């Protein structure tokens, strides 16, 4: 079974879940809020705002003020620098995600196992499932076995507490390292380099992708990474063809 079929299966499950919850959004919102309050009532933040005594959306609005990232940053700093637990939630913190920093300092948020699973299924597998159903409906064909370059770096960087931090969009692929060779032309050493800041990947991404006749997709989180790669191809196609021909 192609590994893309596994992505389709996980995506189908997530799409069914989305369909179920969007049938009655307010009911889903109320259930989700109650679940969050129940699970995190014993965290420092939960005790501060009295999560244990909140039983409705209206009560939550009255007791919990509107907040910004600045309200949570001190908790995140304590987790990173002091390795403190049960601050914002009671689940086990597995790793961190960061924003791009395009509008200032990158915002770092801790992620639990449940968060990572949701990011995996909704952030990655749903798109594969949606593409598969679209191709089947419009062309009457199966989604081809997926193979192509992933133009991104998944290594991340370690923080003071030893846990790694990636951009949120990278996380779903971070945990697929053991199986990337089944759907990715980019070798693991290129996706998970030891010193990513020293590596320009354009040549290597193209060198491995152009030599593979089974390429069916181009993958990236940011489209400019793909356009940069194609700019490199336009300027250096003769060298790439020569290297492929000679087996360099």
Where are these regions (language model features)?
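Nucleotide 5′-phosphate-binding alpha/beta core
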Residues: 1-98, 104-248
């Amino acid at each position: 079974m192609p590994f893309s079929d596994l992505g389709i299966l996980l995506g189908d499950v997530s799409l069914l879940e989305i369909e179920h919850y969007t049938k009655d959004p307010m009911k889903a919102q109320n259930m989700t809020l109650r679940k969050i309050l129940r699970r995190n009532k014993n965290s420092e933040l939960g005790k501060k705002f009295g999560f244990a005594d909140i039983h409705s959306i209206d009560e939550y609005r009255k007791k919990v003020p509107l907040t910004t990232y600045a309200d949570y940053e001190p908790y995140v700093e304590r987790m990173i620098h002091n390795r403190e637990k049960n601050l914002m939630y009671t689940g086990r913190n597995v790793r961190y995600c960061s924003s791009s920093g395009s509008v200032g300092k990158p915002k770092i948020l801790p992620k639990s196992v449940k968060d990572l699973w949701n990011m995996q299924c909704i952030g990655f597998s749903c798109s594969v499932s949606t593409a598969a159903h679209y191709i089947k409906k419009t062309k009457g064909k199966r989604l081809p076995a997926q193979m192509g370059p992933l133009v991104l770096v998944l290594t991340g960087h370690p923080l003071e507490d030893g846990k790694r931090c990636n951009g949120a969009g990278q996380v779903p692929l971070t945990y697929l390292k053991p199986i990337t060779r089944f759907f990715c032309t980019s070798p693991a050493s290129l996706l998970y380099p030891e010193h990513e800041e020293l590596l320009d990947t354009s040549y290597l991404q193209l060198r491995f992708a152009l030599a593979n006749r089974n390429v069916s997709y181009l993958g990236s989180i940011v489209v400019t990474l793909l356009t940069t790669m194609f700019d490199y191809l336009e300027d250096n196609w003769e060298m790439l063809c020569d290297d492929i021909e000679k087996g360099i």
